[in-house]
Structure formats: C-alpha cells, structure tokens
From Swiss-Prot:
Organism encoding this protein: Xenopus tropicalis (Western clawed frog)
UniProt enzyme class: isomerase
Involved pathway(s): Amino-acid biosynthesis; L-methionine biosynthesis via salvage pathway; L-methionine from S-methyl-5-thio-alpha-D-ribose 1-phosphate: step 1/6
Superkingdom of source: Eukaryota
The protein's role, per its UniProt record: Catalyzes the interconversion of methylthioribose-1-phosphate (MTR-1-P) into methylthioribulose-1-phosphate (MTRu-1-P).
Enzyme Commission number(s) of this protein: 5.3.1.23
GO biological process, one term: L-methionine salvage from methylthioadenosine
GO MF annotation terms: S-methyl-5-thioribose-1-phosphate isomerase activity
Gene behind the chain: mri1
Lineage per the UniProt record: Eukaryota, Metazoa, Chordata, Craniata, Vertebrata
Family label: Belongs to the eIF-2B alpha/beta/delta subunits family. MtnA subfamily.
Reactions catalysed: 5-(methylsulfanyl)-alpha-D-ribose 1-phosphate = 5-(methylsulfanyl)-D-ribulose 1-phosphate
Chief subcellular location: cytoplasm
Protein name: Methylthioribose-1-phosphate isomerase
Gene Ontology cellular component annotations, sorted alphabetically: cytoplasm; nucleus
Keyword tags: Amino-acid biosynthesis, Cytoplasm, Isomerase, Methionine biosynthesis, Nucleus
C-alpha cells in the first residue's frame, strides 16, 4: 500500500504533516481554506500536484458547512478563497490552473436557470473530488509511459539505474507520484536495478521524504548528497535522470526544485537522458519561456538552521531560491499522462484534439 499525502472523505480533510517525517507520521485536520493555505505555505504539504489537491479540497470542506446569502456572494467567496490559495506558493502552476478552471466552471454553473448557493456548493465539491481521482489516474499513466519509454533503449531483459531529485512520489501528489512514479513502474516491471535519490538541500525532501517512500515501498535505493550526483552518474553507471516539475512552459523550460538545473548539465556532459515527469496540469503554455516564471525565495533560516540549531556563522548573507529553471535544450523528454514529448513537441502534444 502506498503512502498518502492526504486523506479525504466528504466534509473531512487530513494532510500528512511532512515537516515531521521521517521521525513521526501525523495527519492533521484541515477544516477550511485558511488552514489549507497555511499547510501549503509552511510546506506541511508540498509538491505541485498535492498543493492543488489540498487547495481545492480545503475549499470543498469549508463549503460543506458554510452558507452564503446569495449566488454573487458565493461566487465572490470562492474567488477570494482561490486567490488566497494560489498566493500561498506561486511558483507551482497546478494551483493556479485549478483555480482558473474552477472559476470558469463555477461561472457557467451560476448562469444556469435556478442556480442556488447550495447547488453551486455541491457542484464545486464534486469538481474538487473529481480532481483528486484524476490526479492518481494521471500519475499512473505518467509512470507507465515513462517506464516504457526509458526501456525502449535498453536490452530485452536489461535493468536500468535511475537518479532522481527532491520528492515526487505519493507524498507530492494524490498518489503514485510523477518522477518517482516512473521509478515505481520500472520496479513493478522488474526492470529497475537501483535508484539514487539526492538529499535535496536545504529542505531535505530527498532524505526526509523520498528515502522514506523508497524504504516503505522496498525499492532498492541509495541516498546521496546533492554534490555527489556527478560522481554517482559516472561511477555507478546511472542510466537516466528523472525529475518532477513545478511548472513547464511552452518551450519546455522547466522550473523545479533548486538543484535540478545542475543535474541536467551533468546528465548532458555524461551523455545520459534527462527526463521531466509532470502532469499536464503542471504545464503552463501561456508562458513562452522560463524567464517569465516567478521563483519563490524561502526564509534564510531554512539554510542556516537545522531543527532549530544554527549551523552557519551569524551575519552571513543567504540566498535561498526554492526553484531553478532548466533550459529546454538540456531536457531529453517531458513525460506526461498523454505521452512522452520532446520539449519542442510539448505544445502540440498537449493541445492536439482540444
């Protein structure tokens, strides 16, 4: 059984407080939008897909008990709530896309004859619940497409060795995972020899979360520091690198956890493929290049302190961007629930048939 970042039933939402992992597994109730935004902002929940899921479900939970006088006030409340959730962590595009789609859906529902606040609330709740279900299905497709694509260049029975960064598994999504979903699918097929996961400083999502998931799933894995990646690729014969994404723009430039860019550079130097695994909800075709992506900067104490203990000299300056942007030229392929695309194929691949 996979780990769960969220536990949801109608009117009830609990999130696994990932700040406490791996030492303690504790689910905390989220009773409304404010708690949802706080959980996102403080990184109790993280990962672009999971942020969107928790955001819309926190709204759904609040709507089960909230009453509004009329339809206009209901719409205003939903719009304000979604803005608040988007602002909690702006780099990850999934929450913004979910907010835009939900606002458009709500506007159409409100135009229907006889629309009531109660009926609209039910529609929004059902929309959020459908998003939860679809995320798991999409992640399984990503895993299957990615594994199949990577194995196309391997021998009929050859096993592959992977390297991944940050946390992109069940803890970063509604379930199964994106980049870690690809690793999981390779393992299920019996074609994974090993996976290396980086610790992912300064927030240590790799050592705290990915290592936790890999041990839980009994997947053969080794934890390395971020600075060991190049040596691991060369000396441990890594087949390919696969990472997740917080935002992929139209030309394929990708914003992901800080440290991703350098992995793409070393993968290119060593002549191995570098893949981005992300659902279409993480793809923002409205931005032409990665230069337009807003990069979140985190507090300095996340770099200077560990568990409340300062490890850096007082007075030192700190630059702590949460993400970097990998140029599309360094990306071999983008693995989505609709297939695997070269960066230059992404727009057509995602818009075909729409």
């Amino acid at each position: 059984m996979s780990l769960e970042s969220v536990r949801y039933s109608r009117g009830s939402l609990q999130v696994l407080n990932q700040l406490l992992l791996p030492h303690k597994s504790e689910y905390e109730p989220v009773t409304g939008v404010q708690q949802g935004a706080d959980a996102i902002r403080t990184m109790k929940v993280r990962g672009a897909p999971a942020i969107a899921i928790v955001g819309v479900l926190s709204l759904a939970v609040e709507l089960t008990s909230r009453t509004c006088q009329d339809v206009p006030s209901f719409i205003a409340f939903v719009q304000e709530s979604l803005c608040h959730l988007v602002d909690a962590r702006p780099t990850a595009v999934n929450m913004k896309k979910a907010a835009d789609e939900l606002n458009a859906f709500l506007a159409k529902e409100a135009e229907k004859a006889g629309a009531t606040t109660q009926g609209l609330a039910e529609s929004v709740i059902q929309w959020a619940e459908a998003l939860l279900k679809k995320d798991v299905e999409d992640n399984q497709m990503i895993g299957d497409f990615g594994a199949k694509h990577i194995l196309e260049t391997a021998g009929p029975t050859e096993k592959v060795c992977m390297l991944t960064h940050c946390n992109t598994g069940s803890l970063a999504t509604a379930g199964y995972g994106t980049a870690l979903g690809v690793v999981r699918s390779l393992h299920v097929l019996g074609r994974l020899s090993h996976v290396f996961c980086t610790e992912t400083r300064p927030y240590n999502q790799g050592s705290r979360l990915t290592a936790y998931e890999l041990v839980y799933e009994k997947i053969p894995a080794t934890l390395i520091t971020d600075s060991m990646a190049s040596a691991a690729i060369r000396d441990r014969k890594v087949t390919a690198v696969v990472v997740g994404a917080d935002r992929v723009v139209a030309n394929g430039d990708t914003a992901n956890k800080i440290g991703t860019y350098q992995l793409a550079i070393t993968a290119r130097y060593h002549g191995i493929p570098f893949y981005v695994a992300a659902p279409s909800t993480s793809c923002d075709l409205s931005l032409p290049t990665g230069g337009s992506i807003v990069i979140e900067e985190r507090p300095s104490h996340e770099l200077t302190d560990i568990n409340g203990v300062r490890i850096a000299a007082p007075g030192i300056g700190v630059w702590n961007p949460a993400f970097d942007v990998t140029p599309h030229e360094l990306i071999t392929g983008i693995i989505t629930e609709r297939g695997v695309f070269k960066p230059e194929e992404l727009r057509d691949g995602l818009t075909k048939g729409q």
